[in-house]
Design a protein with these regions (language model features):
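Flavin-dependent oxidoreductase catalytic cores
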Residues: 1-369
Length: 369
């Protein structure tokens, strides 16, 4: 490799977290927890490979936040109870002992729940709008999504509170260094952001600033729960798992509103995920979403994710204004991606069988590491 990859290898401070490099593992749903939401020894081995491989930061797969409506997939881990949170502690301690920091992603499925042991076959969402697309079979889903029921004001207050209590457990009991709110990919907070899935006329719906109220209230609850010193971030995307090509209808003006509002709400970082993060955000030309985030939220840390397993693309996104690069497919194929980069070793191509027929963590995957 003839590229100067040293910018990816420089340390970075995320609030009070000192990261050894600019490389993070992106959150990836692996449905390998116990049926009651406890992380497993297999998950611990899976995550430890990334620490041993040199990643400075690991952002875990989304954990559901309550024993009500938030669970998204069968065998998804939870942060809804003290038992679930405490079961994360050996994993986070092992990562930290290896010099890798860890952030817990917190998730509410909303209308895109494919399995919920607490409310079987039922979903809630901003409005009773049938979700586009079909459930994902590699997460044990089949057929159309259920038509959700519109969430009540009281239930929305519970959602916000549960994000806060889950964040407190993640830091206080599970031992994570920070928390990330899942506001991307078509899940609940993204459903509030999106005009065609949010038809409400109360404080949670209407024009774009009102549709952002759910994210703002959640950020404020999480910040209050973890305090001023703990890093709090939010993941944001245009595309959704059930609506891959979706773009923000308001274009760059909407991006200004979204990024400015999230910054004002008190997050420390925005984690942007796009299929190809270097591409123009809107149309065939123009700035990438990372460039827009840097323009409209200049004081925040920006994490870029999306097709950045090629080092030249990762470097391009640093030049666009990203501070950290989060790898998904690249990390799955090469849990030692940072070590290989440093030593100039070839990277393995992504093997799609890792995520099929079910996207759980496989023994062959761990053996190959």
């Amino acid at each position: 490799m003839n590229l100067d990859t040293s910018p990816l290898q420089t340390p970075f401070d995320l609030k009070q977290l000192s990261l050894r490099n600019r490389l993070a593992v992106a959150p990836m749903t692996r449905v390998t927890a116990t049926p009651d939401g406890l992380p497993t020894a297999t998950m611990q081995r899976y995550y430890q490979r990334f620490a041993q491989g040199g990643f400075g930061l690991v952002i875990t797969e989304g954990s559901f936040i309550d024993e009500a409506w938030s669970q998204t997939y069968e065998n998804q881990p939870g942060m809804a109870s003290d038992d679930q949170a405490q079961a994360w502690r050996p994993l986070t301690a092992q990562l930290q002992a290896s010099g890798t920091r860890s952030i817990a992603q917190l998730q509410h499925a909303g209308a895109l729940s494919q399995f919920n042991r607490y409310r079987p076959g039922q979903t809630i969402a901003p409005s009773a709008v049938p979700p586009r697309g079909l459930q994902m079979p590699f997460y044990r889903g089949e057929g159309a999504y259920p038509i959700p029921r519109a969430i009540t004001q009281e239930e929305m207050a519970d959602v916000v509170a549960h994000f806060g209590s889950a964040a407190a457990r993640a830091v206080g009991l599970a031992g994570f260094d920070g928390v990330e709110i899942h506001g991307a990919n078509g899940y609940l907070l993204d459903q509030f952001l999106t005009a065609h899935t949010n038809l409400r006329t109360d404080r949670w719906g209407g024009a774009l600033p009102q549709r952002l109220e759910a994210a703002v209230a959640t950020i404020q609850a999480v910040r209050a729960a973890v305090g001023a010193d703990v890093p709090v971030g939010i993941r944001v995307s245009q595309g959704k798992v059930n609506d891959f090509g979706h773009k923000w209808a308001e274009g760059e003006q909407g991006a200004e509103t979204i990024f400015g509002t999230l910054a004002d709400a008190g997050v420390d970082y925005i984690h942007l995920t796009e299929f190809e993060a270097w591409q123009p955000a809107f149309g065939a030309e123009g700035p990438s979403l990372v460039q827009l985030a840097r323009r409209f939220a200049p004081g925040l840390t920006i994490i870029a994710n999306g097709g950045l397993h090629d080092a030249d693309r990762a470097l391009q996104l640093l030049a666009h204004g990203a501070d950290l690069i989060a790898l998904g497919r690249g990390a799955l194929s090469n849990p030692d991606w940072p070590r290989k980069l440093e030593q100039g070793l070839p990277m393995k191509a992504f093997d799609r069988s890792i995520l099929g027929p079910i996207a759980d963590i496989k023994a062959s995957e761990l053996a190959a590491a």
